[in-house]
Amino acid sequence: MNIVLVTATRKEIEPLLQYLTERIYLRKHQKVDIVTTGVGMMNTAYCLAKQFAQYRPTLAIQAGIAGTFHPIFAPGMVVSVKEDMIGDLGVMQNDQWLDLCDLGLAEPNTPPWKDKKLMNP
């Protein structure tokens, strides 16, 4: 099994890296690649496209803060994202946020969108 562990910055996963380093010998039939993408969607998309094209992982895991800071998510907490709203694609106009759908640049229910959200299948 080839696993890709994805993070924007290595600092986000330092405790996990220490854990894996100490125990990697237990994973003889599994390969774990660490991919540090840099912050932001464009960096992540570029790095993952390059990684996936070359190595074809069996499983990819996003680790780190995943672009969010919220007091209900304690450091080290594991979450599964069911849906996502992209806060980087849009504009502020008259003190109001307008997303791609509001601007007429995307349809709210045309894949990959559902009710203006990206759904995790």
Residue ranges and their predicted role:
Residues 1-55:
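N-terminal short beta-loop-beta anion/metal-coordinating cradle
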Residues 12-13, 67-70:
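Short, active-site-adjacent cap segments at secondary-structure transitions
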Residues 56-61:
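Proline-aspartate-enriched helix->loop->beta-strand connector
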Residues 70-121:
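Mid-sequence, gly/pro-rich, charge-dense loop/helix-turn segments that line enzyme active sites
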